[in-house]
Amino acid sequence: MSTLETTRAELGLVVVYLNKAEARDKICRAIQYGSKFLSDGQPGTAQNVDKNTSLARKVFRLFKFVNDLHALISPVPKGTPLPLVLLGKSKNALLSTFLFLDQIVWLGRTGIYKDKERAEILGRISLFCWMGSSVCTSLVEVGELGRLSASIKKLEKEIGNKDKHQNEQYRAKVEKSNERSLALIKAGMDVVVAFGLLQLAPKKVTPRVTGAFGFASSLISCYQLLPSHPKSKMV
């Protein structure tokens, strides 16, 4: 590829990435929690950025609860153990509830919904739902990693003395295992973030700790949404 073609391809990936509403939301999330880390809960510019970005992000999530509602009623892959099915459906139900209630919180903060006290209560309930969905996600990922580990070990025995890294199926399973490990780390971080937003342990999970974990999990989300890099042509 020429330099111009390479640059055009790279910019094309950026355009594809930024065209995703989810990607823009996660970039804003990184800004939000980065500002929370800098402010440490103290009044000032950083705290204003945190609050304003948090409100702006809610617009990205309007009607997003439908996605998890659809996943809730969709069939699961055959062979999935019942405990993982139940945990997965619980995650969908809790996340859908969080996103639905979050819309009422947005209406309250914009002044459309007048009962501010009820909006605040619903806001706390929504955060508990999000924390619950993150816990369910963590447990699902642990279970799926266990299944993948057993599958990889079985495949290693079948491959025998051959170079396992040359086996396409083996590489795919290892890549999937890495993806699930990253998802597990992110879900664990999100539990801490929810804990901090709910102020369940304000002395330990301070706004700065919440901001640090939220910023890190946002970067992971941004990475997970990256489009696949086009393979360069061999001459």
Curated annotation (Swiss-Prot):
InterPro entries: PEX11. Involved in peroxisomal proliferation. Promotes peroxisomal duplication, aggregation or elongation without fission. The keyword Metal-binding does not apply. Can complement the yeast pex11 null mutant. One of its GO terms (biological process) is peroxisome organization. This is Peroxisomal membrane protein 11C. Homooligomer. Interacts with ARC5 and FIS1B on peroxisomes. Belongs to the peroxin-11 family. Coiled coil: none annotated. It is a multi-pass membrane protein. PANTHER family: PEROXISOMAL BIOGENESIS FACTOR 11, PEROXISOMAL MEMBRANE PROTEIN 11C-RELATED. It comes from Arabidopsis thaliana. Residues 109-206 are lumenal.
